[in-house]
A protein has these predicted regions:
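Glycine-rich flexible loops
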Residues: 1-130
Length: 130
């Protein structure tokens, strides 16, 4: 559902998902990639997804679904479950208000990354316009 209301942009999707559940940057620190609408099951969507999977472990297919990759079934299932949970929380937030009053800040993400020994790309830690 989020591909109908968020810009189809890796930075925006990653940041919104990260802000919706504190564990997200720890579970998918590289962020998520977004594929604009494409015919499902075809070569073009497969190639675009493969391109994104060079950088991310998660690809969101606009108006279709999600593709995840991990070291084994359990890690991959946990990854998909975490993304799905965060998306569900974000849908609930957006159903209540178009803007958040408080959220996890870039500095909070940096603290989290330090304490959990993960590296978060700075491209996702931008200051949002108020």
């Amino acid at each position: 559902a989020l591909t109908f209301v968020l810009p189809l942009d890796d930075q925006v999707f990653t940041r919104e998902l990260w802000e919706s559940a504190t564990e997200c940057p720890v579970v998918f620190p590289d962020g998520v990639g977004v594929v604009g609408w494409m015919v499902p099951g075809g070569r073009a969507i497969a190639e675009k997804t493969a391109e994104l999977m060079e950088k991310y472990d998660v690809a969101i297919w606009a108006h279709h679904g999600m593709f995840c990759s991990g070291e084994d079934f359990d890690l991959t299932f946990g990854l998909m479950h975490t993304v799905e949970k965060s998306a569900e929380i974000l849908v609930k937030i957006l159903s209540m208000t178009p803007r958040k009053i408080q959220t996890i800040t870039p500095e909070n993400f940096r603290e989290l990354a330090h304490d959990f020994n993960v590296t978060l790309p700075e491209e996702f830690l931008y200051e949002k316009k108020k």
